[in-house]
């Protein structure tokens, strides 16, 4: 047994070290004071410092990292298969392969826990802003949904459109305006104040769509990364969502609320329209589940331009429904639940309660 341990000493020590690190993290994460201190004074300052370097490059360093990691993984698996065929001690080779995969996976998970998971246990945006989610009656939900629909109809005329009436503002223009969108909200939400950089467009955006992602924040580089293949009408509010993660807001439901509230307050007609569109979708979905007839009455008031944007978006995402999409959703759902979002991906719907508290 001792000889067996010595033969794979490096991998065993690696596994024990990562396991110990995760054990410490899980033991200490219920301590809010410590999590707040780590988030505000260690983790987020570190990520912003790393981001300031990564933003010197136009290419997403996060995307490059994923491509390199995938390439290394493919090369490693191919090398292991070659050794299994050409060399003796196949059991030893297989064991090392298994242990390497486990150690690598746990190390990446530990990195996400330390660089991002801590923020799930620090003060939430609700605690920092004083805006707490609340339940509401169907009548209240109907009133706020109708108000969003009315504002959305007015805002629809203030954005460029193509010959089919669909949103046609260039993505370059949307990205260029991103760094000034948060400024008008700083007075009301000082916890959101930070220096912004232009988010990164992902070259392999179709792959993101296949996994049902409109964007992602990468804590290892501090970059906000966006899917630029999907319809652009939701891109501005999605940018604000990912930039909320850069501010240490971990909860998806809170970032959706921030995306809507900041977009509406931005003074930029393109971002305002996108924020209203996102808000209407969340509120409308909740109202439809509660009372389809009330939802239909409001839906019938939308102009053709808004309907065109909603249909274009629905048609785009419907084309990606399948096993890859389902698998990616399950993986992300598990990650959210492991970090305290008990409803997993369903927690996105809770944004309605925050919208009702703020706009109701």
Label each region the model flagged.
Residues 305-360:
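Pan-zinc metallopeptidase signature
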Residues 117-185:
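Membrane-interface segments at or immediately adjacent to transmembrane helices
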Residues 73-78, 91-126:
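Transmembrane alpha-helices and immediately adjacent membrane-cytoplasm interface residues
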Residues 139-143, 148, 250-295:
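Post-HExxH zinc-binding segment in Zn-dependent metallohydrolases
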Residues 19-82:
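Membrane-embedded alpha-helical segments of integral membrane proteins
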Residues 160-228, 232:
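Auxiliary, metal-adjacent structural segments of Zn-dependent hydrolase domains
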Residues 4-18, 96-101:
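Alpha-helical transmembrane segments and their helix-start/interface "positive-inside/aromatic belt" motifs
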Residues 58, 235-256, 260-261:
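Active-site recognition of the HExxH zinc-binding catalytic motif
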């Amino acid at each position: 047994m001792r000889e067996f341990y010595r033969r794979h000493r490096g991998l065993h020590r690696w596994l024990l070290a990562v396991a110990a690190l995760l054990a410490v993290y899980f033991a200490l994460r219920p301590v809010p004071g410590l999590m707040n201190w780590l988030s505000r004074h260690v983790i987020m300052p570190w990520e912003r410092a790393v981001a300031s370097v990564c933003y010197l490059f136009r290419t997403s360093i996060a995307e490059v990292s994923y491509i390199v990691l995938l390439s290394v993984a493919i090369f490693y698996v191919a090398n292991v298969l070659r050794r299994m065929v050409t060399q003796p001690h196949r059991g030893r080779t297989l064991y090392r392969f298994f242990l390497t995969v486990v150690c690598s996976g746990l190390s990446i998970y530990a990195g996400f826990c330390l660089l991002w998971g801590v923020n799930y246990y620090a003060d939430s945006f609700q605690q920092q802003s004083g805006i707490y989610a609340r339940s509401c009656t169907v009548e209240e939900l109907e009133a706020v949904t109708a108000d969003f629909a009315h504002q959305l109809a007015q805002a629809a005329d203030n954005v460029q459109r193509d010959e089919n009436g669909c949103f046609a503002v260039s993505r370059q223009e949307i990205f260029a305006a991103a760094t000034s969108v948060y400024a008008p909200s700083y007075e009301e939400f000082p916890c959101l104040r930070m220096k912004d950089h232009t988010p990164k467009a992902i070259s392999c955006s179709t792959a993101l769509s296949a996994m049902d992602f409109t964007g992602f924040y990468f804590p290892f580089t501090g970059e906000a990364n966006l899917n630029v293949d999907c319809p652009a009408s939701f891109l501005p509010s999605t940018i604000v969502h990912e930039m909320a993660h850069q501010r240490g807001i971990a909860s998806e439901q809170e970032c959706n609320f921030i995306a809507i509230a900041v977009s509406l307050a931005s003074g930029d007609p393109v971002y305002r329209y996108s924020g209203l569109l996102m808000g209407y979708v969340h509120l409308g979905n909740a109202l439809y589940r509660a009372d389809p007839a009330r939802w239909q009455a409001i839906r019938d008031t939308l102009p053709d331009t808004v309907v065109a944007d909603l249909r274009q978006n629905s048609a785009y995402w419907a084309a990606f429904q399948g096993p890859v999409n389902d698998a990616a959703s399950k993986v992300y759902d598990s990650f959210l639940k492991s970090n305290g979002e008990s409803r997993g991906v369903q927690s996105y719907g809770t944004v309605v309660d925050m919208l009702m508290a703020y706009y109701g």
